[in-house]
Amino acid sequence: MRRQLGSDAGLTARMFLTMFLLAALYLFFLAVLWQAGVSYTGIIVFVAIMLGVQYYFSDRMVLWSMGAKEVSPREAPELHALVERLAALADLPKPRVAIVPTPMPNAFATGRNPANAVVAVTTGLMERLTPSELEAVLGHELTHVKNRDMTVLTLASFFATVASFIVQNFFYWGGAFGGGRDRDERNNIMLVYLASLVVWLVSYFLIRALSRYREFAADRGSAILTGSPGQLASALVKISGSMARIPTRDLRQAEAFNAFFIIPALNGNSIMELFSTHPSLERRLAYLRRLEQEMEERR
């Protein structure tokens, strides 16, 4: 039984909390820069410009990086029909549709808001899934669009990337141990480095935690839209099994986009789930089984 897809209160609360904590973290970093005597006006202007570019052009950047091609209803009528029907059920404007020519079975959604969203699937995904399974995967991606979690994740990840860049290039820029610097200057440089490290680490784990929860929320949304959690579970098993047979070299080329995929290109064991953008397959299947039982009880 299909039901109306509403907002996910749990995800909304977590997104607000994550953004609040990250904002506090970045204000702390600016305070450290001020304490160290660093003129951060230019840094703020540069970051603001890059953030604007990331916000407005993220969809084009992701599609270009993945080699995705937007397709018309004439080129992919069945795919467009599925997307259009699910978008109507989710009370969303129909997103643009793209296909990625790769044997790796996966799907993702991108775009700064529902009016500018793109849903993309790979040729490998369309070849492996039944129409019902494909519908369930598309329902998952459209739930991301509905929840607007793509935008929050993109903005949050941008600042974490800036902090990571500072940490990784610190010693290249001269480090705290270069010659010709007095003791206070070396201490200030080390202070900025340590603050960048803290910002990066805390941001990393906050974003990963939000990313894992949003996958559960999207799985739930797919179950509501299609009325069939079992079809999504079947699709996840097929995708995960197919990914295991793809050469690691090919998977690593797509690893940077793990947060956008329905299944990460590379996944670790359960011990490493804390570092993952997605919950483990086992946890997602167990969650979908619970949803199916709940839906059966309501029928």
From Swiss-Prot:
One Gene Ontology cellular component: plasma membrane
Transmembrane intervals: 15-35, 37-57, 158-178, 187-207
A GO MF label: metalloendopeptidase activity
Disulfide bonds: none
Membrane topology reported for the UniProt record: Multi-pass membrane protein
Gene3D superfamilies with a match to the protein in the record: Metalloproteases ('zincins'), catalytic domain
Top EC class for this record: hydrolase
Active site: E141
Keyword Cell division: no
Location of this chain's protein in the cell: Cell membrane
Annotated positions binding Zn(2+): H140, H144, E215
Family: Belongs to the peptidase M48B family.
Protein's name in the database: Protease HtpX homolog
Gene name per UniProt: htpX
